[in-house]
Amino acid sequence: MEALSGRVGVKCGRWNPTAEQVKVLTELFRAGLRTPSTEQIQRISTHLSAFGKVESKNVFYWFQNHKARERHHHKKRRRGASSPDSGSNDDDGRAAAHEGDADLVLQPPESKREARSYGHHHRLMTCYVRDVVETEAMWERPTREVETLELFPLKSYDLEVDKVRYVRGGGGEQCREISFFDVAAGRDPPLELRLCSFGL
C-alpha cells in the first residue's frame, strides 16, 4: 500500500494535470480554441503527454468544462451588469477582446519562471493557432448537391434512357448523366429511383 501512496491519482483514476499541461490548455483556450476536433484533441494530448500522463478524453472534458465555466461567468457578469449598483469593470474589456477572432496572439510571460518555458510554448502555440485558424476556414461551408428523390415511383423502366439519373453539377454545366443501374445486363431494379434537380 505504501508504494501507491507516493503516486497521485492512481487509486481514484482522476486526471490531475500538471502546471505545464494547464498552461498549454489555457493558452489554447485564450487563443480562441473552444471545440477542438478529434484530430486536434489527439495532437494536443500527444503534446501534453510530454509533461505528464494524459488521455484524449481528459483534453476533451477540459475544454467542455472551461466552455461551461465561461458561459457561467458571462451569465453572472450580465446579471451583475444589469443591477443598478454595478459599475463597469476592467475584466469586461479584456473579455470582449478575447471574444474577437483577431485576438490570436499569446500573452507574454509574467514571471521569470514562465519566461523559461515561454519560448518553446510560444512557438508551439503560434504554429498551432495558425493551423487551427486555417483548418477552421476550410470548415466554413461544404458544397453539396441538392437532389430530390421520387418517393413513390409510378412507372417502371421502359426505355434505357429512363435508367439514367441526372445530377445538377457545379459551375457552368446544368446536368450530367450518371449511369444508375447495369443496363447492359438487362437487370431492372424493383423500384425506380430518379434523382431530379430543381433550380434552387
Curated annotation (Swiss-Prot):
Gene3D superfamilies: Homeodomain-like. Residues 91-101 have a biased composition (Basic and acidic residues). Pfam families: Homeodomain (PF00046). Disulfide bonds: none annotated. The keyword Cell membrane does not apply. Residues 10-74 bind DNA. One of its GO terms (molecular function) is DNA-binding transcription factor activity. It is found in: Nucleus. Specifically expressed in the central cells of the quiescent center (QC) of the root. Residues 70-118 are annotated as: Disordered. Transcription factor which may be involved in the specification and maintenance of the stem cells (QC cells) in the root apical meristem (RAM). Belongs to the WUS homeobox family. This is WUSCHEL-related homeobox 9.
